[in-house]
UniProtKB/Swiss-Prot annotation:
One GO biological process term: RNA splicing
Keyword tRNA processing attached: yes
Record function comment: Usually encoded in the trnK tRNA gene intron. Probably assists in splicing its own and other chloroplast group II introns.
InterPro entries documented for this protein: Domain_X (IPR024937), Maturase_MatK (IPR002866), Maturase_MatK_N (IPR024942)
Protein name: Maturase K
GO molecular function list: RNA binding
Record's GO cellular component terms: chloroplast
Pfam families from the UniProt entry: Intron_maturas2, MatK_N
Coiled-coil region: none
Family as reported in the entry's similarity comment: Belongs to the intron maturase 2 family. MatK subfamily.
Subcellular location: Plastid, Chloroplast
Length: 514
């Protein structure tokens, strides 16, 4: 990458047309095929691969020759697979060509990402899971409105090509990308749609396509939002000091003229914050209701003008934190007022001051969790436990271990919430469902199962000690668990509640597109 960048600085004409010749290099397809075999071997044993899955470089040469002879690279995919992006039984040739196309397009993208980290570009990534919980702890309590939106993934294929065209000067290198996208658009599943729905399948090409599209959305939108509002401050500092400081600033503003407000406003805290998890960005705003209405109005217009796609206004929802809760990542997010007692000693006198501060208070959504358990056949819709019939063929230890693992995952995921009393209702449902499953397996009653297995067995698996049997929990954390907040940033990736809302919204939108 460094060599490409150095050559690009020396010769700008070479920088404009260096991508397209890479499609004719056999080494590129060898690398992509090795990557394809590595991915396949991780999910499928090598002895189960047929002889047709082996790549012949003689056929690769013929495919490269077809690219040289034909102006349109669509013939390359016709000979390999009728629908390479939709059919899961992909041939090694179409997969290798897509991998090679991704490798070529990743060259300028990697250079841009590398030098943006070094300071050439001021844009920073907001999609890290580690940035979500500091946002909730630090920025969320200082906002009074939340804009809940989503990044639209339904877009015309030509718009995707134009996003690449903004930073790739080599126009011929985008012809294979255009052919692949239009091939997918003309597939039987998308014939009734006028736009392409970017599928979220775990392939290198589609992940690269989606990441670049999100990069383009955020690199334009986030600096625009921050430029429209006041500069950011480095930190909030202690709450009492900042509270008295804001009172002084408000007093100064009343006495100054209007033209001097810019220097005063620069001392205040930022008024807008942005974070994203998956396809769902969250914009926290501290301002008036009129400001929130302007943001809701301009966000769809910005997407319509910049990306040439229509985004319905109902996709941007606003929530006032003092009245409503906002659901995200499987939590019900709210802000509550917390009284703070401050004692100040000056010489021989002691002053006691009561301050009211805002505190982030996530709520455990018991009703959605019960709905998810009902969907997985652990209970009915009213929360009454039932037996898990599909697990009756397992051993007793496996059944107990599975139920206990589900409970510990739920408990660890919601360990960042202070009020966890409602979680023990979930524990009751899982423990009783486990007992009913064992009773159904042994064709007996719950009382007989408890008498045969012993009450100590259920205490062993569903005990409070096992709730803290986790590397992040220590003995001190277990003792002070009710007043300490511990976040587990790896669990949202596997928690169904974090993505259930998004799946429902995607199904509604896709039905409207058909």
């Amino acid at each position: 990458m460094d060599e490409f960048h150095r050559y690009g600085k020396e010769d700008s004409s070479w920088q404009q047309c260096f991508l397209y010749p890479l499609f004719f290099q056999e080494d590129l397809y060898a690398i992509s095929h090795d990557h394809y075999l590595d991915v396949s071997s991780s999910s499928e044993p090598m002895e189960h691969l047929s002889s047709n899955d082996k790549l012949s470089f003689l056929i690769v040469k013929r495919l490269i020759g077809q690219i040289r002879k034909q102006n349109n690279s669509i013939f390359l995919f016709v000979n390999c697979d009728p629908n390479p992006l939709v059919n899961h039984n992909k041939s090694s040739y179409s997969e290798s060509v897509l991998e090679g196309l991704t490798l070529v397009l990743e060259v300028p993208f990697s250079i841009r990402s590398k030098y943006s980290v070094e300071g050439i570009n001021e844009w920073k990534s907001f999609r890290s899971i580690h940035s979500i919980f500091p946002f909730l702890e630090d920025k969320f309590p200082h906002s009074n409105y939340i804009l809940d939106t989503r990044i639209p993934y339904s877009i015309h294929p030509e718009i995707l090509v134009r996003t690449f065209r903004r930073w790739i000067r080599d126009a011929p290198s985008l012809h294979p990308l255009r052919s692949v996208l239009y091939k997918y658009r003309n597939s039987p599943e998308n014939l009734k749609r006028s736009i392409i729905v970017v599928p979220r399948v775990n392939t290198r090409f589609l992940l690269f396509l989606w990441n670049n599209y999100v990069y383009e959305c955020e690199s334009i939108l986030v600096p625009l939002l921050k430029r429209s509002f006041h500069p950011r401050s480095s930190s909030y500092g202690s709450f009492p000091e900042r509270t008295h400081f804001h009172r002084k600033v408000k007093h100064i503003i009343r006495n100054f003229r209007r033209n001097s407000l810019k220097s005063i406003w620069s001392l205040k805290d930022p008024k807008i914050h942005y974070v994203r998890y998956g396809e769902r960005p969250i914009i926290a705003i501290r301002g008036t209701h009129l400001l929130v209405k302007k943001c809701r109005y301009h966000l769809p217009i910005f997407r319509q003008c910049y990306f040439h796609l229509w985004s319905e206004p109902y996709r941007v929802c606003s929530h006032q934190l003092s009245k409503n809760c906002s659901s995200s990542l499987g939590y019900s997010l709210r802000v509550r007022m917390k009284p703070l007692l401050v004692r100040t000693k000056m010489l021989d006198k002691l002053f006691i001051t009561d301050l009211i501060t805002d505190e982030f208070d996530p709520i455990v959504p018991i009703v959605p969790i019960i709905g998810l358990l009902a969907k997985e056949k652990f209970c009915d819709i009213s929360g009454r436990p039932i037996s898990k019939l599909s697990w009756t063929s397992l051993t007793d230890d496996d059944i107990l271990d599975r139920f206990d693992r589900i409970w510990r995952n739920i408990f660890h995921y919601y360990s960042g919430s202070f009020g966890r009393d409602g979680l023990y209702r979930i524990k009751y449902i899982l423990s009783l469902s486990c007992a009913k499953t064992l009773a159904c397996k042994h064709k007996s009653t719950i009382r007989v199962v408890r008498k045969e297995l012993g009450p100590e067995l259920f205490k062993k698996y569903f005990s409070k000690e096992r709730e803290f049997d986790y590397p992040a929990f220590s003995s001190k954390a277990a003792a002070h668990s009710q007043r300490e907040r511990i976040w587990h940033s790896d669990i949202p990736q596997i928690n169904p509640l974090a993505n259930s809302w998004q799946k429902i919204q995607d199904l509604r939108i896709e039905r409207k597109l058909i």
